[in-house]
Regions:
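Short clusters of hydrophobic/aromatic residues that line enzyme substrate/ligand-binding pockets
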Residues: 17, 303, 307, 359
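Feature captures C-terminal
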Residues: 4-6, 16, 30, 34, ...
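Short, surface-exposed secondary-structure junctions/capping segments
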Residues: 283-287
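Acidic, metal/ion-coordinating pockets
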Residues: 1-280, 317-323, 328-329, 388, ...
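Glycine-rich phosphate/diphosphate-binding loops and the adjacent beta-loop-alpha structural elements
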Residues: 298-319
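Intrinsic-disorder/low-complexity loop/linker signature
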Residues: 122, 201, 304-305, 310, ...
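Short, flexible segments with low predicted structural confidence
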Residues: 52, 77, 301-303, 310, ...
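Acidic, glycine-rich low-complexity/disordered segments
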Residues: 289-298
Length: 506
């Protein structure tokens, strides 16, 4: 249409190129190859194509790349260059493999990175904004990322970086654009989500600064379109005079925002990737994909216990023995008194023959292991926090809805081995741990323990501030998948007795 301006945007692709599940090879409507087919249909001379971050981490293909060929340009980076983006933003997970990996990605992705609210070696990493002329109109575009990254990321990965408050940065940038440019439209790419319900404005999470999308929409006048991300939600609408979008993860959706200057209208919509994948992109990565698939099918060892997860709810309610195994490995590796792990969304567990595919489908993040020193008092606070995962509804134990919406956060329910404890869900929050023992003795406030956990939790991720403040004893830089694979290959046959140390009651 003459005069129509089109914005196409991806977010939270998480390393997915191919349209299938790496857990069972089933076909799925995901991946950048399908997104490219959509873009090829929708793109014209009046179109801008943007990516809103979280590209490098997530898929087994990318994990395999960083384990085996980290000095090469990654498949997803080359796929982005093939799709030919105009501008890109960074997300929090793009820092997971370290500074060198991020810089190699940004230097080879084929599009300028315009993230403006973090400093690298003391200097702004990206421009404050960029200007593009599209269909005779002047468009200002800027990118920001959640400033909460230092609360999750390994310090070594961001040691040369400083993050500025995303909201304050957006506010200052919009003022600057208005004063210097007087554009027809302002587009904000924000790798962050919404902290409030978009309908009634009620808080849906603690106001930590992780997500400030609602605050930006409500308070900053002049942004015409905000492309959000991070929470993997499907959203398209208008609030406080600003249009917004957010897409599901793994390349399952594409945001399409059509701007019609002639009648001053904007139409945002979310398109599903239910289309044939682009054959040229699939062909580009045949070798890497085949190598990854062969690696995933390696048998590492066997176990005398069936550790498959068939019901995630039950696996959390009654602590699946796959958690017992993960904790056992962490404890043996670190020598810690206690160990904690969460069952991630979609985790498959292991059959009696354990393959690398089982590992990466069960432990889906590139986390490392940290040992913390805690007191009995801190341990109880920690368990009370994790017990918030449960609630009573119609006299049944159910998952607290805040762990499902606006973003699934099942990874924030930890299960701890090395102690025995009972969660009474009907008790008030903060008073649910009714029994807590260590080696048969009641845990007292002044007792001291070492506890192994992932680096995300060790930095206070999930609002576990009591853990963040606890002293760090040691850090193992091996990924948890690497640690598990080495353990299984060393032992060949994993033989252990099931441990049922957690009781959850009404």
């Amino acid at each position: 249409m003459t005069g129509r301006i089109r914005i196409l945007a991806t977010s939270d692709v998480h390393g997915y190129i191919y349209p299938h599940s790496y857990a069972d090879s089933s076909s799925k409507d995901i991946g950048l190859a399908k997104i490219k087919s959509l873009v090829n249909i929708l793109r014209d001379e009046n179109t801008l194509v943007l990516d809103n971050g979280d590209v490098l981490e997530g898929s087994p293909l990318m994990y395999h790349h960083f384990v085996k060929t980290p000095d090469e340009v990654s498949p997803i980076t080359r796929a982005m260059a093939d799709l030919n983006y105009d501008y890109i933003n960074v997300g929090n997970h793009d820092f997971n493999y370290g500074e060198e990996a991020l810089m190699m990605h940004l230097q080879n992705a084929g599009a300028p990175c315009i993230t403006s609210n973090f400093f690298y070696h003391g200097k702004p990493f990206g421009p404050n904004y960029v200007i593009r002329q599209v269909a005779g109109k002047k468009i200002a575009i800027f990118g920001i990322v959640t400033q909460y990254i230092p609360n999750w990321e390994k310090k070594s990965h961001i040691k040369h970086m400083r993050f500025v408050d995303a909201y304050l940065s957006a506010e200052a940038t919009v003022k600057l654009i208005k004063r210097l440019e007087n554009p027809d439209y302002i587009i904000c790419m924000y790798h962050g989500g919404f902290e409030r319900d978009l309908v009634n404005g009620r808080l849906t999470e603690d106001e930590t600064g992780e997500n400030e999308g609602y605050k930006i929409l409500r308070n900053i006048r002049g942004i015409d379109v905000m492309i959000s991300g991070h929470q993997h939600r499907t959203e398209a609408g208008k609030l406080y005079d600003t249009y917004y979008t957010q897409t599901a993860a793994n390349g399952a959706e594409l945001a399409c925002i059509d701007i019609y200057p002639d009648n001053n209208t904007i139409e945002p919509r979310i398109l599903k990737a239910d289309i044939d994948a682009d054959p040229e992109m699939l062909k580009l990565f045949e070798r890497e994909e085949a190598t990854c698939q062969a690696w995933l099918d390696q048998t590492l060892g066997t176990t005398n216990v069936d550790l498959r997860v068939t019901d995630e709810f039950d696996a959390r309610l009654h602590k699946s023995q796959v958690i017992t195994f993960l904790n056992k490995v962490q404890q043996e590796k670190t020598g810690a008194d206690l160990s904690s792990n969460a069952l991630f969304l979609g985790a498959t567990g292991f059959g009696r023959d354990i393959t690398m595919r089982d590992l990466v489908s069960t432990y889906v993040y590139p986390n490392t292991t940290v040992v913390k020193k805690i007191t009995g008092k801190i341990l109880r606070e920690y368990l009370e926090k994790t017990a918030e995962f449960w609630m009573i509804h119609n006299e049944h134990i159910v998952v607290n809805p805040s762990y499902d919406w606006p973003k699934p956060q099942h990874y924030n329910y930890d299960m701890v081995d090395g102690i025995e404890y009972t969660i009474k869900v009907s008790n008030p929050v903060g008073h649910r741990i009714t029994s807590l023992t260590y080696q048969g003795n009641d845990v007292t406030d002044d007792m001291e323990f070492t506890i192994a956990m992932n680096n995300y939790r060790a930095t206070g991720g999930g609002n576990y501030n009591m853990i963040k403040e606890a002293p760090t004893i040691s850090t193992d830089l091996s990924s948890m998948v690497e640690l598990l694979a080495n353990y299984i290959q060393e032992h060949k046959v994993i033989d252990f007795e099931p441990v049922n140390n957690i009781t959850v009651i009404k």
